């Protein structure tokens, strides 16, 4: 964590006794709890990391809620992240988030692997974040959980830290409708295969950046404002049309409003797939497992009626909601053990 923690922690006037008490309190979390019969010290350490991670995640969520709109710069609600992760199912390979905020996508990916009895070492994590404060939050978030990642601080569009990366999975929640991305300096960029995005809105710059970094059998899942599905301003409609005609759009999910701390407007999830006949192949070697051939097809899921209000301004998706959305996608895709897909009027 060198260069990450604020310099205030090293200043001479700091109450060293109080700081020591805090350090001891954190150090005691789960490390000194009795071990169940048959479990070794490694289990205790894992529990300690998980507990610390949960505490950190809790405070991130509380901070994002208190900050309101500005909180959206670093925090994606955990339930939205879980929808993305459950649908992409990143068991093995390279996971990439070019605007990773506080690192929630990475944390959720590792949780998914653990929940499905996978091996953490089977995935490699790459990312980039332009906001220095947010980058520091992510570094601490990952360090607390013992997650190893190749994450960089810098502008993804203008100084791509992973220019040659071809990822098996891309997960992201880019800034909505960002007009301050200096797009006028990148008009002829090689990433704009489907058309130069407008300088006043980075939505389709992000989409094409994701596509650029996808492996031949790669999958991408990301959050965008609902306007991305219908906007025709400044050539956005033509870019969207070109992406659709390239048969990259695998699934679209319309989510209910009030899920985010930063905005009350409804958002949607985009899922792109380069190869609609195979699952991702770790490391880009050949092809992965076969699934139903969905070339020329796209699944639409209308989840706008799901979720429940947890307070006056915020809604949250339940575990049942998550299972319903992800289950429909995996059944449609033809994943092993997902069951038969059936159209449900008003939902999919």
Task: Give names to the regions the model predicted.
Residues 1-91, 150-161, 254-257, 293-308, ...:
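Non-catalytic, mostly N-terminal accessory regions of nucleic-acid modification and defense proteins
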Residues 25, 29, 58, 62, ...:
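Conserved, well-folded catalytic cores of nucleic-acid-processing
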Residues 38-40, 283-286:
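Glycine-biased, low-complexity coil/linker segments
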């Amino acid at each position: 964590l060198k260069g990450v923690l604020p310099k205030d922690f090293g200043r001479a006037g700091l109450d060293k006794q109080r700081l020591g008490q805090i350090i001891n309190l954190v150090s005691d979390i789960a490390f000194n709890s009795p071990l169940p019969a048959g479990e070794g010290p490694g289990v205790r350490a894992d529990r300690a990391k998980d507990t610390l991670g949960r505490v950190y995640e809790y405070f991130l969520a509380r901070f994002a809620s208190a900050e309101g709109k500005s909180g959206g710069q670093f925090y994606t609600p955990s339930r939205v992240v879980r929808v993305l992760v459950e649908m992409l199912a990143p068991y093995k390979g390279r996971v990439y988030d070019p605007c990773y905020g506080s690192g929630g996508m990475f944390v959720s990916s590792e949780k998914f692997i653990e929940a499905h009895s996978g091996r953490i070492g089977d995935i490699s994590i790459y990312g980039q974040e332009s906001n220095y404060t947010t980058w520091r939050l992510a570094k601490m978030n990952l360090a607390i959980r013992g997650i190893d990642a190749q994450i960089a601080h810098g502008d993804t569009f203008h100084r791509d830290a992973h220019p040659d990366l071809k990822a098996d999975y891309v997960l992201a929640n880019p800034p909505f409708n960002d007009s301050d991305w200096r797009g006028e300096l990148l008009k002829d960029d090689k990433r704009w295969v489907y058309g130069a995005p407008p300088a006043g809105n980075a939505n389709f710059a992000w989409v094409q950046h994701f596509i650029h970094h996808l492996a031949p059998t790669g999958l991408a899942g990301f959050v965008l404002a609902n306007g991305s599905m219908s906007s025709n301003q400044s050539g956005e409609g033509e870019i969207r049309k070109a992406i659709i005609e390239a048969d990259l759009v695998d699934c679209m999910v319309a989510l209910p409003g009030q899920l985010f701390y930063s905005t009350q407007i409804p958002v949607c999830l985009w899922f792109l797939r380069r190869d609609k006949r195979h699952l991702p192949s770790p490391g880009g070697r050949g092809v992965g497992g076969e699934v139903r051939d969905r070339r020329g097809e796209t699944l639409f899921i209308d989840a706008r009626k799901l979720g429940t209000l947890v307070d006056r301004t915020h809604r949250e998706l339940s575990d049942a909601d998550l299972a319903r959305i992800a289950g429909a996608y995996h059944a449609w895709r033809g994943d092993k053990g997902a069951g038969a897909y059936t159209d449900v009027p008003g939902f999919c």
